[in-house]
């Protein structure tokens, strides 16, 4: 089950970032979180959306003031994600074990 705070964060990221997909992964996706856990989000961005580092900075800025729990955000372009999700990578873990919370 996705927490209310995770839903709020994913909605804000969807509106501000315009991703192709948003995954929640890690302990919150596996329902094994504890008091010190953070949210882990993977944003699959359109291939023409620009530099991943700059996109990450924008994503973190968009969440200022709306979250209580720490958040980690990973940005990847769609073509890379689609290739890497079948290899032993973070993308495979996200694809297999993550929760797809948004898809365009």
Q: Which functions belong to the PLM regions below?
A:
Residues 1-21, 29-35, 45-104:
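Catalytic core of pol beta-like nucleotidyltransferases
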